[in-house]
Structures are given as C-alpha cells and as structure tokens.
Amino acid sequence: MFTMKKSLLLLFFLGAINLPLCQEERNAEEERRDGDDEGSVEVQKRFFPLLFGALSSMMPKLFGK
C-alpha cells in the first residue's frame, strides 16, 4: 500500500510540474506568432512613408514642374 501511495504521489508531482512548463511553452509560442504580425505592420508603417516621400520628390522631376 505504501509503495502505491508513493508512486501516485510521484505521478501527481511530475504532472503538477509538467503542466506549468507546457503552459509556458504554449504562451511563448503564441507570443512568437503574435509578434510576427506586429513586425509586418511595423515594416509597412516604415515602408509606405518612404515610398510616398520618394514618389513626391520624383514627380516634379518627371513632369518638369
């Protein structure tokens, strides 16, 4: 009986440790996935003003105004 309690206690302990580790890994993966979306938005924010600035400086040269 004592060995059965001991092994059940060990299983409970290992399960209790394993659960938070899995949750941390899942949260890190979700943050990594969410971070990719934010990075692409930031790249778009940086790219479009540069593109519009370059086009506005080239337009007068192209049309001779």
From Swiss-Prot:
The keyword Secreted applies. Transmembrane segments: none annotated. The keyword Cytoplasm does not apply. It is found in: Secreted. GO terms for biological process: antimicrobial humoral immune response mediated by antimicrobial peptide; defense response to fungus; defense response to Gram-negative bacterium; defense response to Gram-positive bacterium; killing of cells of another organism. Residues 23-44 form a propeptide. Keywords: Amidation, Amphibian defense peptide, Antibiotic, Antimicrobial, Cleavage on pair of basic residues, Fungicide, Secreted, Signal. It comes from the Eukaryota. Expressed by the skin glands. The modification Phenylalanine amide is found at F63. Its main location: secreted. GO terms for cellular component: extracellular region. Has antimicrobial activity against Gram-positive bacteria S.aureus ATCC 2592 (MIC=2.5 uM), S.aureus ATCC 43300 (MIC=2.5 uM) and B.subtilis (MIC=15.0 uM), against Gram-negative bacteria E.coli ML-35P (MIC=30.0 uM), P.aeruginosa PA01 (MIC=2.5 uM) and P.aeruginosa ATCC 27853 (MIC=2.5 uM) and against fungus C.albicans ATCC 2002 (MIC=5.0 uM). Belongs to the frog skin active peptide (FSAP) family. Temporin subfamily. This is Temporin-LK1. It comes from Limnonectes kuhlii.
